Amino acid sequence: MPMTGLLQTTLSTADQDRSGPAATTGDTPARANTKRLHVITWGCQMNVYDSARMTDVLSPLGYTAHAEPEGADMIVLNTCHIRDKATEKVFSELGRLRLLKEARAREGQPMLLAVAGCVAQAEGEQILARAPYVDIVLGPQTYHRLGGMVRRAMNGERVIETDFPPEDKFDYLPEAAAPQHGPGLAGGRTAFLTIQEGCDKFCSFCVVPYTRGAEVSRPASSVLAEARRMVRGGAREITLLGQNVNAYHGLGEDGEVWTLARLIRALADIPDLLRIRYTTSHPRDVSDDLIAAHRDIPQLMPFLHLPVQSGSDRILAAMNRRHTAEDYFRVVDRLREARPDLALSSDFIVGHPGETDEDFEDTMRLIERVGFAQAYSFKYSPRPGTPAAERDNHVPEPVMDERLQRLQALLRTQQEAFNTACIGKTVNVLLVTPGRHPGQIGGRSPWLQAVHLDAPATLIGQEVPVTITAAHTNSLSATLPDCAPHPKELTCA
């Protein structure tokens, strides 16, 4: 399963850490022998987490985060392979970075250039062949070895490490220096925490099993220790990450294998951790105890990203999803019975090879039947090496365009209706960042909507009741009610 909610902008590690307790940016005077590191992050939330951990790995070598590529002693491009033309986008960016490297060389200041992430894993040899100025190519399972790779590169070696190592990288990564915050959210009030990596599902369209490997789960003790450090650093909401996160099966502190639900129950006991989320999930791994966790644990937010991809049983079989539309309906109904205020988001692919008009109409009917608060939708794009790419019954581009427009129009209508239904409700919002206007602050609703209101900045980091006054395409406006009590969360459905 690919992670979703893809970040469409380029993010640097310094952007993530600028307001954190251990932040170092380009505005901070460099210590003696300090080297400046700029990390460009493309793709999913796990890549954001990985970029921060690579920064931690390089810290003992004297590297600190630098806000801009200009002036950096090392640049890491952390890549994503999910969308179309991913490889060519990487080479385009590398061409830009090459100019910076050459300019630094003319000044007698060498710069290391590394390519990490899923494109590096899939195209490692090609990157070295087409971009001879790249010093290091490393896949997602070798980040714990990055320090050694840097030493080799500084001695003139061109390094490529894309094999899956026998050791588990989670056993060797250093402790996180600071919370890994969500993009654009100040103060580290929200954090990403990877607990599981890889996928064993092998959907026909997906490269993740080939770039991230088999499913691996972190020991519960490691997850809990990092979560406690994040909370001590100011995090009040933690999102648990995994390519197939609800397949989590880490070794527990009692020696038993823990499920995701059991891990969430342990996390809920951490003082001052107000909110827990997880992404991305597979419908086949929504277990009875996970449904019970949604019913029983108030810290577990009533918002779930549950990709379905298609509403056609025939296409679901072609995708190797190993569930039917009816299976998905049953899971959704059970979740909503357990947590009536639960809102859903999902992923949809239109134009998978062999998709007919009737298959597409099945998808539209599924969307109408379920109702989504938000969703991500894409045209099918063949990924080299995947079974779907080898098929010869591809859907014409104009047909995919028309289907995507119809599907997105329906999803947009549902999202607007969900947001509009919030008007007049009082909901708990975690306030996380100053707003774009003076006197304004921003936060997150339980359903992951951005919420903006006029309120003092001293409230940042708190979860407070607000009254929703207006709905916009991607956000809500709110005011602080006159009442002092902390109300129960109310559904906007």
UniProtKB/Swiss-Prot annotation:
* CDD domains in the cross-refs: Radical_SAM (cd01335)
Annotated residues that bind [4Fe-4S] cluster 1 are located at C44, C80, C118
Q: Which UniProt keywords apply?
A: 4Fe-4S, Cytoplasm, Iron, Iron-sulfur, Metal-binding, S-adenosyl-L-methionine, Transferase, tRNA processing
- Specify the protein name: tRNA-2-methylthio-N(6)-dimethylallyladenosine synthase
Residues of the region (Disordered) are 1-31
- Which species is this record about? Granulibacter bethesdensis (strain ATCC BAA-1260 / CGDNIH1)
**GO cellular component terms attached to this protein's record:** cytosol
Q: What is the purpose of this protein?
A: Catalyzes the methylthiolation of N6-(dimethylallyl)adenosine (i(6)A), leading to the formation of 2-methylthio-N6-(dimethylallyl)adenosine (ms(2)i(6)A) at position 37 in tRNAs that read codons beginning with uridine.
